[in-house]
Amino acid sequence: IRCFITPDITSKDCPNGHVCYTKTWCDGFCSIRGKRVDLGCAATCPTVRTGVDIQCCSTDDCDPFPTRKRP
């Protein structure tokens, strides 16, 4: 499977059986810059704490960098 990986946001091969993920959360600059984003691959969908959103998928390049809605 191929997943986008941060910080370069490039598509890279991940080991067989892994899933791609997009993890987003707010930090101190969330109102100005939007949510922080972490893209990667893992053996299983990571468990996250409250306030962190995660989406996992299992097809090539299914985790593109999320677009931010403009006001």
UniProtKB/Swiss-Prot annotation:
GO terms for cellular component: extracellular region. One of its GO terms (molecular function) is toxin activity. Keywords: Acetylcholine receptor inhibiting toxin, Disulfide bond, Ion channel impairing toxin, Neurotoxin, Postsynaptic neurotoxin, Secreted, Toxin. It holds the Pfam family Toxin_cobra-type. Disulfide bonds join C3-C20, C14-C41, C26-C30, C45-C56, C57-C62. InterPro entries: Snake_3FTx, Snake_toxin-like_sf, Snake_toxin_con_site, Toxin_cobra-type. It is found in: Secreted. Expressed by the venom gland. SUPFAM superfamilies: Snake toxin-like. Binds with high affinity to muscular (alpha-1/CHRNA1) and neuronal (alpha-7/CHRNA7) nicotinic acetylcholine receptor (nAChR) and inhibits acetylcholine from binding to the receptor, thereby impairing neuromuscular and neuronal transmission. Belongs to the three-finger toxin family. Long-chain subfamily. Type II alpha-neurotoxin sub-subfamily. This is Long neurotoxin 1. It comes from Naja naja (Indian cobra). The lineage of its organism: Eukaryota, Metazoa, Chordata, Craniata, Vertebrata.
